[in-house]
Amino acid sequence: MGIARKPEVMSPAGYWPQLEAALDAGADAVYFGLRHFTARAKVGFGLGELPQAMAALHRRGARGFVTFNTLVFDHELREAARALAAIAEAGADAIIVQDLGVLKLARAIAPDLELHASTQMSVTSAAGVRLAESLGARRVTLARELSLADVRAIRAETRCELEIFVHGALCVACSGQCFSSEAWGGRSANRGQCAQACRLPYELVVDGKVKPLGDARYLLSPGDLFALRQIPEIVGIGISAVKIEGRYKDADYVALATRAYRQAVDAAWEGREASIDTRQELDLEQVYSRGWGPHFLNGTDHQAVVRGRAPRHRGVRMGRVTAISETGVTIEPADAHRLSPLKPGDGVVFDAADWRSPQEPEEGGRIFEVLPRGGAMELRFANRALDPARIRRGDLVWRTNDPELEKRIRALPAERLPVSVRVNAREGAPLIAVWEAGGIQVTVESAAPLGAARNRALDAELLREQFSRLGNTVYALADLELAVEGAPFAPASLLNQLRRDAVERLEAAAAAPRRIEIRDPMTTLDEIVSIGMCDRVDRRKRLSHFAGEAMGQAFSPANSSGSGDPPPSLHLLVRTAEQLDAAIDFRPASITLDYLDLYGLKPSLERVRAAGLCPRVASPRILKPGEERVVDFLLSCDCPILVRSAGLLDTLRGRPHAALVGDFSLNAANAITAGELLALGLDSLTPTHDLNAAQVADLARAVGAARCETVAFHHLPVFHTEHCVFCRFLSTGSSYRDCGRPCDEHRLALRDSSGRAHPVMADVGCRNTVFGAEAQQASAHLEAWLSAGIRHFRLEFAHESAAQVVAVSQAFADALGGRLDSGELARKLARVSPMGITEGSLFVPPDYLELPVLQ
């Protein structure tokens, strides 16, 4: 696919100051959220402010994209439908969506409104792009874990618009696949409530023992993305938009980052070499940085993405401490000091060099005086601003704040919208001027014919002099064409009035809301739900029992209970050969194999078959370009597949396959989404872990409980990450090619400040999953789930031994068979689980049905 058009520079806005900063710096588009249904809670515009925000954007020739990129629960769908209609009515240029149900709802309410698939959709392949496009997305924001080679491969296989992040914070977990906030804080990253557990300190536990890592404590905290130097290559790939992260960042950050990428994109598009100097990089680093690089865009390097020293803004490294005295701190300056010297008023922090825990508060403050000391310099501070005892020789010095830079940013000239003017001036006829800016064209003309000039006739110089007086507007005169017949005379007053009229009309036309079809949101929602119910009833008529192949022998008619309902069945997911031995002895309805090495599990599959049991195989949660062989392998297993990505689901639609069970990672949070996924070919579905136990039951009733498989015991997969902790901290390698595969030899866990050790496991793609230390279990909710008609219960094991697998499985079998009440089940599970048990995400808060009304 050729390069169709220049990529948009897309900037973030938390509120008005950031929006205005983005426009002044030349953003083509600005993305922002409302107060709810957005992946960045606590920032955004009120619904009543949206028309004003869109008008401000359109007056500057920019587009406005509203983020609606969270999962939406069933009880919120009516409020969501009203919000979607209001967003369309306000003139939004696009809505950025995570939830497949919201995608369908938005398309039905406003068929002409542009829809973008959020990075929260976890799209990492051409198949994922095609699926999003088939469901109505015009643009897809690709996952930040992709390399430029991956992006180029996806571009070659698709025609949909693609967008990538080029600057700002990185999440350690794949977007849309993080459940740490849900597990540990009762709040969800998929709901805009990220608790930033990745920025907390952890100890590395290897085979049961803590491994010293020096000053590396923040083992899941990645540095920031900085891809300014990769822009020429990105433009050459044919990307539709380059995106700057940062809806929580301030206006200075937005202004500086937008201007830098604006200049880089313009230069690359015009074939010019980008003029990126060290001072510009230092300014960007100063305004906000945790340490940065192109990271995944340049390919895998697990040594570079996470340094582990600090999780917060560092700014620019300005030197190293050489001496400490009662009057001040002497430092040897770094190269950055030559371009951007330290000065009074700067804020600095002293970064302890291997002698103090990075978790402790750091010494720092504002410089009062800078004194040269030969090649060094002494920094002095106000009285008692520092504790000299907490600073030592060798400590790094970072400038975290530069007031002078802030002044320079705010003094930068605002980008203007170029305007072209074509003028026809003929003696004896009205003067006609056509003004065009940002794709909008208006025509103004004089009320009376032009007379003959007695002295100076109208010429281009006079016209430019009057029409270029646009200082208090958003426009700048770029091109002027004049066609003259005779020697017409046009007074300056007339030209000035025509200029004012043209500007007024351009601004009015730009700010006018786009007129698109908007259907009644409540009627539309009711129609979608009604049609979905009919489809589900029809499917149930065609499926007398649910996916017998996928669910194992327990679901044959011979095993049904007298009431016509099948008995409850257990499905075990195992990750080790030892666990498999125990699972086969237990004889569940099915056994799902979720092994590190896919290519070593076929003998295990045969063992399950030989035992007369139903085998299933789990797919990776992420599949990238070049990993298509994994799909071939999954199909060659000739057994049901636990599908964990939408891209894989799309790929399997076109190929013969056994039964498909959709996993939690598909993020089915409401009945519309669940219906869409089932319609795409799934035989059953596991709800997202963002739902509490009551919501799981409600969703099962809505979609048909026979098609729901719930997880009743597991360690919540809190992080799923491209970054490999094994490679980073147990090797000197950068990827699987040179790491020596420590994941084959060692058991790993991350121990948090409370002493909980969270298991870490790698998959076939070397991606890591960090599991919650405590076992999440549904003992308190089994009765309610059974009452909702749920009969499929999955038990998943991480580091459990064979004995623990047997004990947990037997306890659930006894509970489902009526031989154990919920309290006894919980007590048994607690005795089996060394780190304890928890309700975790299944906990049902008393106020969970309350949704703040959008203002």
Role assignments for model-derived ranges:
Residues 538, 542-547, 555-561, 565-567:
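Short, low-complexity intrinsically disordered segments enriched in A/P/G/S/L with frequent Arg
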Residues 42:
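Glycine/threonine-rich flexible loop motifs
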Residues 68, 108:
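Contiguous, structured surface segment used for ligand recognition
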Residues 45-49, 55:
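Glycine/small-residue-rich interface belts in oligomeric ring/scaffold proteins
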Residues 1-24, 29-39, 53-54, 60-67, ...:
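Surface-exposed amphipathic alpha-helical tracts and adjacent flexible/coil segments at the periphery
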